[in-house]
Amino acid sequence: MAGLKRRVPLHSLRYFISMVGLFSKPGLLPWYARNPPGWSQLFLGTVCKGDFTRVIATKCQKGQKSQKKPSHLGPLDGSWQERLADVVTPLWRLSYEEQLKVKFAAQKKILQRLESYIQMLNGVSVTTAVPKSERLSCLLHPIIPSPVINGYRNKSTFSVNRGPDGNPKTVGFYLGTWRDGNVVCVQSNHLKNIPEKHSQVAQYYEVFLRQSPLEPCLVFHEGGYWRELTVRTNSQGHTMAIITFHPQKLSQEELHVQKEIVKEFFIRGPGAACGLTSLYFQESTMTRCSHQQSPYQLLFGEPYIFEELLSLKIRISPDAFFQINTAGAEMLYRTVGELTGVNSDTILLDICCGTGVIGLSLAQHTSRVLGIELLEQAVEDARWTAAFNGITNSEFHTGQAEKILPGLLKSKEDGQSIVAVVNPARAGLHYKVIQAIRNFRAIHTLVFVSCKLHGESTRNVIELCCPPDPAKKLLGEPFVLQQAVPVDLFPHTPHCELVLLFTR
């Protein structure tokens, strides 16, 4: 009924989050762009139940018939390369202009559903709300395109497993699922988002593996040694390679021999063609582990790579987070800086700060920058970057934001103006971080950056904007979503950064 006001209990939040999940439910994408060839109107109108990337790949393969899972994989050919491209870069068949239309439509639909739910939580009639731009209460800006469309990744991680020809020493990306037992590792040199240098290093690592007497570690309990390869590059062309190795029961002497062999291969052997700036080796018995859990061992070269961004020289350690599209990151960080509205009286709180680029780029415009980051190496990089660039009004703290933030805020006076910037991982922010932000009255402006606004990130936004809830210890006034800016850092994929400005 028109004008009906109703409050939605917060316990129904789980249902809403399941409905707003990116590319996971029918009708989420409006697809108002021109229909790509081979995509049916039914598909375009109901996108899309199930896995988005799989549906995209299927619909884009015009005229291809479905095939049963082969009893043997056979040689590598164009079909394997296309299948991998459809999984890793499902929008690769569209022009970049069409890709941007798809992404903008998706972000708009997510915001519409999110706003509608928040309005109901606050007892506002959705039918009488006055929109600012096309059914949205917040101002949705046009999507900012990536300055670089192809080969934009500055970091790639390659797996090792059986290729289409059955060779277990194949380096690339996975097709299939472990559940179905049909995982195939396909070389990635044809993917549009991978730079040639990354593919070159991966190819030479494959050459090395195939001449090594040691087997790869495909499944932990089955033994094997050689594991994944990570390649990092900067805009100057410097290249860092990180090889992960399962030590099994090798002695330190035996491990030393293997490190010397791989080092020799990339310095004086065939791998010298890669021109690596540095080579790291990490012994790991876990799927993934940090430098603190298992130190990265520098076999040769420089311990860091450096990047120039926003007039800063930035140091990047092997496991430090840095946006994978450097040129796009500059657009993203400029957008964040503009939305913060900081001035010389402002304290900038940079939560999940990584190497500290956002805070440090705004340091000259603020009274102080306070950064919080989980990874010690990233914090060390941020401190180095601050010192090298002559920035003296910043401090960075290592640890979990939910443990550090409450104490950090208590030490500040209520009269100080604080602007918070959060750029969490896809898992979102811990609920105690949300509590601390909501309950600290001096935070009037919050900029939230999300590369995938669903799941916990959606819950974060809703708990920032919902009415005070003593049961959840959300006592402060709610934030209001004012502006949203999509920034494309991931051409050829459905992903997109979304920068949200909240005030109260």
UniProtKB/Swiss-Prot annotation:
Q: Does the keyword S-adenosyl-L-methionine apply?
A: yes
- List, in alphabetical order, the Gene Ontology terms for molecular function in this entry: rRNA (uridine-C5-)-methyltransferase activity; tRNA (uracil(54)-C5)-methyltransferase activity, S-adenosyl methionine-dependent
Report the domain of life of the source organism. Answer: Eukaryota
Under which EC number(s) is this enzyme classified? Answer: 2.1.1.35, 2.1.1.-
| Reaction catalyzed | uridine(54) in tRNA + S-adenosyl-L-methionine = 5-methyluridine(54) in tRNA + S-adenosyl-L-homocysteine + H(+); a uridine in 12S rRNA + S-adenosyl-L-methionine = a 5-methyluridine in 12S rRNA + S-adenosyl-L-homocysteine + H(+)
Predominant location category: mitochondrion
Q: Which GO terms describe its cellular component?
A: mitochondrial matrix; mitochondrion
Chain segment of the transit peptide: 1-16
Active-site residues, Swiss-Prot/TrEMBL = C451 (nucleophile), E497 (proton acceptor)
Residues annotated to bind S-adenosyl-L-methionine: Q323, E373, N423
Instruction: Tell me which Gene3D superfamilies the record gives.
Output: 2.40.50.1070, Vaccinia Virus protein VP39 (3.40.50.150)
Q: Which GO terms describe its biological process?
A: tRNA processing
Q: What are the alphabetically sorted keywords of the record?
A: Methyltransferase, Mitochondrion, rRNA processing, S-adenosyl-L-methionine, Transferase, Transit peptide, tRNA processing
What InterPro entries does the record tag this protein with? SAM-dependent_MTases_sf, TRM2_met, TRM2B_chor, U5_MeTrfase_fam
Question: What protein family is recorded?
Answer: Belongs to the class I-like SAM-binding methyltransferase superfamily. RNA M5U methyltransferase family.
**Function field:** Mitochondrial S-adenosyl-L-methionine-dependent methyltransferase that catalyzes the formation of 5-methyl-uridine in tRNAs and 12S rRNA. Catalyzes the methylation of uridine at position 54 (m5U54) in all tRNAs. Specifically methylates the uridine in position 429 of 12S rRNA (m5U429). Does not affect RNA stability or mitochondrial translation.
* Record protein name field: tRNA (uracil-5-)-methyltransferase homolog B
Q: Which gene encodes it?
A: TRMT2B
